[in-house]
A protein has these predicted regions:
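Residues on the lipid-exposed face of transmembrane beta-strands in outer-membrane beta-barrel proteins
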Residues: 40, 44, 72, 76-81, ...
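Transmembrane beta-strand segments of Gram-negative outer membrane beta-barrel proteins
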Residues: 30-58, 70, 91, 224, ...
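Glycine- and aromatic-enriched membrane insertion/assembly motifs of diderm outer-membrane
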Residues: 63-100
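Surface-exposed coil loops of outer-membrane beta-barrel proteins
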Residues: 48-70, 100-217, 227-234
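Outer-membrane beta-barrel channels and translocator barrels
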Residues: 33, 82-86, 132-135, 146, ...
Length: 372
């Protein structure tokens, strides 16, 4: 499982295993331009909604919102120089273009005052240094993807087992942060990360408060990884008194070389965000199963439920559920082709159909991505 390898290798992308050797290794020679790496990814897809919505829109989806239309999801170019030796400076910049960029663009950068994102984005841009304290204290400053959640925004170094994204990914947690984060490997089993940022998906802060994120990562074995996240801070415009808080739990367990399990749970609330000025709450859980069938073939299943008690996250008070079946084939070492058979269910009639709104939404999708 791609996500499992990322988590188990470092208990989230910010907790690099290179930190464990940072103190013992001598400083790396400054190789200048030769040390800079270039990577990339191209993802394209097609989705068909069996409800036949007149607007040709898949309701409540994160990225796969276009019905009956071929789409360029994202083109990504990453330029980076990893830092691993004490006091060695590094950086990473992710340039993206496509439909994904329009959704995840941060306010204050490629999202205008009306809230409309553009088809280009500076997905990540940060500088890094490893301070020679203990096993190595890693410091990152700039813009980076969130450390919350089981699923990721697809990139050259990580993508999900399912082609579509969960409700938890889209509505329970943020996409990116801009600020400062420090991470430290206490032992091969326990890692920590602390971040202070402007907020959720903001390059320019919308109030005078800051958002704080604490992460604990546990890797009891090479096959099991558990991440606990807590994030809190004011996120409303010109309001630093009312906080948004989320507790996020992620676990992956590789039972065998062919069978992997995953879990994600989120519990969130926000003061003064419910109708009437009360506290809004949302929660959900998702389960994942991936089975390597044979050779380049694999099959993944995701099932989840998400309760938006007050409608603060989806716009209407409802409980959403979905199940997704994803067959996959790898064409060589750089190309992945995935199908996506998905059924969304709500306790409210929120899904557009040919003659009105329904409580279910079945879709069929295909996705191809190439990375280097």
């Amino acid at each position: 499982m791609r996500v499992l390898r990322i988590l188990a290798a470092g208990v989230a992308a910010v907790l690099s295993p290179r930190l464990l050797a940072a103190q013992a290794s001598p400083p790396a020679a400054d190789t200048g331009r030769a040390a800079v790496e270039f990577h990339g990814l191209v993802s394209t897809s097609y989705s068909y909604n069996l409800n036949l919505p007149p607007s040709r829109t898949n309701q409540l989806r994160v990225f796969d919102t276009d019905d009956a239309e071929a789409r360029l999801d994202v083109v990504e170019l990453v330029v980076q120089r990893p830092s691993s030796a004490p006091w060695e400076a590094g950086f990473r910049v992710d340039f993206t273009a496509g439909a994904v960029s329009r959704v995840v663009a941060s306010r204050g950068l490629f999202r205008d005052s009306a809230g409309e994102g553009q088809d280009i984005d500076l997905h990540q841009a940060f500088v890094s240094v490893v301070v020679p304290l203990g096993s190595g204290l890693r410091v990152d400053a700039g813009k980076f993807v969130t450390g919350l959640g089981y699923e990721v925004i697809e990139g050259f170094d990580g993508w999900n087992d399912n082609a579509s994204h969960s409700f938890l990914f889209g509505y329970a947690i943020p996409f990116t942060h801009t600020g400062l984060r420090v991470s430290y490997a206490i032992s091969p089993v326990l890692s920590t990360m602390l971040m202070v940022a402007n907020g959720w998906d903001d390059v320019r802060d919308n109030n005078s408060g800051k958002t704080v994120h604490l992460q604990l990562g546990l890797t009891p074995s090479s096959r099991l990884a558990i991440i606990l996240n807590g994030i809190a801070g004011p996120e409303q415009d010109n309001d630093s008194r009312h906080f948004r808080d989320v507790l996020d739990v992620v676990a992956t367990w590789k039972l065998t070389d062919r069978l992997s399990l995953g879990f994600n749970g989120d519990w969130g609330q926000e003061a003064a965000a419910a109708p009437g000025g009360g506290t809004a709450a949302w929660s959900g859980v998702a389960g994942y199963v991936r089975f390597g069938v044979r050779g380049p073939f694999a099959l993944s299943v995701r099932a989840e439920t998400f309760q938006d008690r007050d409608g603060a996250r989806t716009g209407i008070a409802q409980t959403l559920s979905e199940i997704t079946l994803t067959p996959e084939v790898r064409l060589g070492t750089s190309c992945v082709v995935r199908g996506d058979l998905r059924l969304d269910v709500s306790d409210r009639a929120v899904f557009e159909g040919a003659s009105g709104f329904r409580r279910t939404q079945p879709t069929v999708s295909v996705n191809a991505l190439y990375h280097f």
